[in-house]
């Protein structure tokens, strides 16, 4: 059986193997035959089976089309469905990141102070940009932060994100909040206040940073009450002023009746941590949201002296209310299908113009691309379900894509000043898991995509990671026994990685 033999855009991608499987669909590693770049392709199955899930997909595609930043994961392409009104599956092509921050923390128990600082700096830069657009992420956690072995981080999974408008009723705005409890701000644990702010994301970043420092979740609550207990064990009981502003009577009563707790000095909790890091962490984890800094204020903290230059960190105008009018309406399945189709057309400019002019899709332009993918994914899934690592049958190419070696400096940050370059270089020199030999490093360097360091000209030591084998982020010669297969944890990591889509930076 041959693949990609008929006319269609799917022939641009050469599928390699399944790297993950989840409730939404299947993720496969692939090569873009036009550029030689490795990408991840996610097939989202039966998008419209549940309208709520379809709306989440629509929201994420739309939000991340509008948020274009070096520290946010990038979508490359979305394949055009064969029909406008009957399609069920979506194929999303996005940049292939090597791992996520959860795996990096688990695999690296001796991250340096330089790692700590650079990780937090990137997260706050992304958050500054996101919040400037009036977007709240609402589900920040280590598994929703992708990572490469050169310490590059990118925020992903905006399915729970919301855009804040001044005239939006807060009761409607927050009724579906279901983010991960461990990283949830205390005001969200008990519906403390009538209006929420970007401070909810700042709290999550604080929890993530604490986990980077210690290697363990800071507040692993079993339920909401236990979560509040853990928070107050560290921070102490909130002030009477804060308690008086809590609108939820049960939450206010519970905290008021709680035995008085005194805060634990962060220096006792986080041994050997940089005092400046702990001072900033205390600000990020203020119980009262009004006492937390904004992302921009946090970036101006003395902790980042030498690498931070606020004038260089991008912001953007608030997103248009028109883009998210659908959040205020009750949508049918057909409504969501049409809106998702419209978002897909953003990656097909010519078709978009025809759509805007009122013309129908010209189906013969792409008669079989998705059908080819369906057969190919079916082949891969069959082998995957048997626990086999499978490479699909495919045609032989007369000339394979050229190998590409990317610069050690992210192309999106080429205008960085010398101070930041020195900081990044210093961090890279401290990374863990060096290649076994210079010769092996030379052989592998050309295969690394997007932002991976060129070992030929700049040998550096990599972060360890328990990442998926298909990503080739880990030097293959150094694989441990856990990296030879795809564990359940890895399936979840890959699925969560693949569930996040953004528009390609122009």
Curated annotation (Swiss-Prot):
GO biological process, one term: intracellular signal transduction
SUPFAM superfamilies in alphabetical order: Protein kinase-like (PK-like)
InterPro entries in the cross-refs: Kinase-like_dom_sf, MAP_kinase, MAP_kinase_CS, Prot_kinase_dom, Protein_kinase_ATP_BS
Chain intervals for the UniProt region annotation (Disordered): 384-421
GO cellular component: cytoplasm; nucleus
Gene Ontology MF term list: ATP binding; MAP kinase activity; protein serine kinase activity; protein serine/threonine kinase activity
Gene3D superfamilies: Phosphorylase Kinase, domain 1 (3.30.200.20), Transferase(Phosphotransferase) domain 1 (1.10.510.10)
Phosphotyrosine: residues bearing it: 177
PANTHER family reported for this sequence: MITOGEN-ACTIVATED PROTEIN KINASE
Family listed: Belongs to the protein kinase superfamily. CMGC Ser/Thr protein kinase family. MAP kinase subfamily.
Name used for this protein in its record: Mitogen-activated protein kinase 13
Encoding gene (name): MPK13
